[in-house]
Curated annotation (Swiss-Prot):
Role summary: One of the primary rRNA binding proteins. Required for association of the 30S and 50S subunits to form the 70S ribosome, for tRNA binding and peptide bond formation. It has been suggested to have peptidyltransferase activity; this is somewhat controversial. Makes several contacts with the 16S rRNA in the 70S ribosome.
Organism for this UniProt entry: Streptococcus suis (strain 05ZYH33)
PROSITE patterns: RIBOSOMAL_L2
Alphabetical list of InterPro entries matching this protein: NA-bd_OB-fold (IPR012340), Rib_uL2_dom2 (IPR014722), Ribosomal_uL2 (IPR002171), Ribosomal_uL2_bac/org-type (IPR005880), Ribosomal_uL2_C (IPR022669), Ribosomal_uL2_CS (IPR022671), Ribosomal_uL2_dom3 (IPR014726), Ribosomal_uL2_RNA-bd_dom (IPR022666)
Subunit structure: Part of the 50S ribosomal subunit. Forms a bridge to the 30S subunit in the 70S ribosome.
Superkingdom of origin organism: Bacteria
Protein's name in the database: Large ribosomal subunit protein uL2
A single BP term in Gene Ontology: cytoplasmic translation
Keyword Disulfide bond: no
Length: 277
């Protein structure tokens, strides 16, 4: 999918870019796979803001995407490649030979009319899903499970990919997009290929209104707030932070503080950390 560059006919159009949606084959989703999605605007059940900078935006329907890929041995034909407003990747509508319809994350190179299948005996072909233990070393994969049968949880964003590095007993070594090398059970499934729509991160929204269409509200710097709103607030004019280190609106250390649980049980499965040289 290419990038479309606009002429600076207005201030909002200057530097604006968008995807050309050349891969999208239909604008009408499969009705049986849609679910109503109520906007929460970052609020919890008490109506309090628990996630800032969310609210507004265009109304969406949630597309039921099959992350499990557990219909073994049943072939499916790719019918459409569609836009999904709920994720950065595109999705593909597939029709199984037994009549079932499903959405999957559309990998790079997947085309309408292509046949895909899942299961331990599946070929190493883009769009096919199989256990990690059955995938050769060096293969690029996405939509990786962390627990067998729970569905893919890792490597689902546009342009993301991971690589199978080897096998150690019942575990398979996988290098993730971040550079982290992790051991994952060989019975966990993954889909062959890279997630499509890899140009997604290069889009320049161009104007504030386009962020609002996506349901993203403005992010205000703490230094321009009042002291009762943020620890960085107050002072005369453009005042510095005034503290030993930057902090969150709730006074906790920000920018660089490690937030991972030091007793996380999954530590033993991480062979190489993402920031390790």
């Amino acid at each position: 999918m290419g990038i479309k560059v606009y002429k600076p006919t207005t201030n909002g159009r200057r530097n604006m870019t968008s995807l050309d949606f050349a891969e999208i084959t239909t604008s009408t989703p499969e009705k049986s796979l849609l679910v109503a999605l109520k906007s929460k605007a970052g609020r919890n059940n008490n109506g309090r803001i628990t996630v800032r900078h969310q609210g507004g935006g265009h109304k969406r329907f949630y597309r039921l995407v099959d992350f499990k890929r557990n219909k073994d041995g049943v072939e499916a034909i790719v019918k459409t490649i569609e836009y999904d407003p709920n994720r950065s990747a595109n999705i593909a509508l597939v029709h199984y030979t037994d009549g079932v319809k499903a959405y999957i994350i559309a990998p790079k190179g997947l085309e309408v009319g292509q046949r895909i299948v899942s299961g331990p005996e599946a070929d190493i072909k883009v769009g096919n899903a199989l256990p990690l233990a059955n995938i050769p070393v060096g293969t690029v994969v996405h939509n990786i499970e962390l627990k067998p049968g729970r569905g893919g949880e890792l490597v689902r964003a546009a342009g993301a990919s991971a690589q199978v590095l080897g096998q150690e007993g019942k575990y398979v070594l996988v290098r993730l997009q971040s550079g982290e090398v992790r051991m994952i059970l060989g019975t966990c499934r993954a889909t062959v290929g890279t997630v499509g729509n890899e140009q997604h991160g290069l889009v320049n929204l161009g104007k504030a209104g386009r962020s609002r269409w996506k349901g993203i509200r403005p992010t205000v710097r703490g230094s321009v707030m009042n002291p009762n709103d943020h620890p960085h607030g107050g002072g005369e004019g453009k005042a510095p932070v005034g503290r030993k280190a930057p902090s969150t609106p709730w006074g906790k250390p920000a920018l660089g503080l490690k937030t991972r649980n030091k007793k996380a049980k999954s530590d033993k499965l991480i062979v190489r950390r993402r920031n390790q040289k």
